[in-house]
């Protein structure tokens, strides 16, 4: 299987970094998945989303989570995030300490070109 960069140069990642209330981590994951996989998630309907997000859990602190996804347009992501925060209000956000669910945006400034990744593959 060919290697693939995590993201493409020129796009953006949103990185949410948050702490879930102690003892409610499994409930948080369940509520997150219920919302994320539903038709009610407007993020999945945006053409600006390049790669769907992944929810990650810190290996040293089980209360700490990260949500990372690739977007072509962070202005569009911020617009949809505002709708989530002010109108939809997903239940999983209620389990985040401080109820703060705001990402850090970062630009992808380097991504290994496909021809270099392909050349690095072992012969079959």
Locate predicted features.
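Short acidic, gly/pro-rich beta-turn/loop elements at beta-sheet edges
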Residues: 26-28, 63-65, 77-79, 113
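Glyoxalase I/VOC metalloenzyme domain signal
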Residues: 23, 61, 72-76
């Amino acid at each position: 299987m060919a290697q693939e960069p995590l993201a493409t140069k020129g796009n953006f990642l949103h990185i949410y970094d948050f702490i879930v209330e102690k003892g409610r981590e499994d409930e948080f994951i369940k509520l997150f998945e219920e919302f994320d996989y539903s038709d009610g998630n407007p993020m999945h309907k945006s053409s600006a989303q390049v790669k769907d997000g992944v929810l990650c859990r810190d290996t040293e602190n089980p209360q700490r989570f990260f949500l990372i996804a690739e977007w072509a347009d962070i202005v569009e992501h911020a617009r949809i995030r505002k709708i989530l925060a002010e109108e939809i209000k997903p239940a999983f956000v209620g389990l985040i300490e401080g109820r703060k669910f705001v990402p850090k945006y970062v630009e992808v400034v380097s991504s290994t070109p496909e021809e270099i990744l392909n050349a690095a593959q072992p012969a079959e």
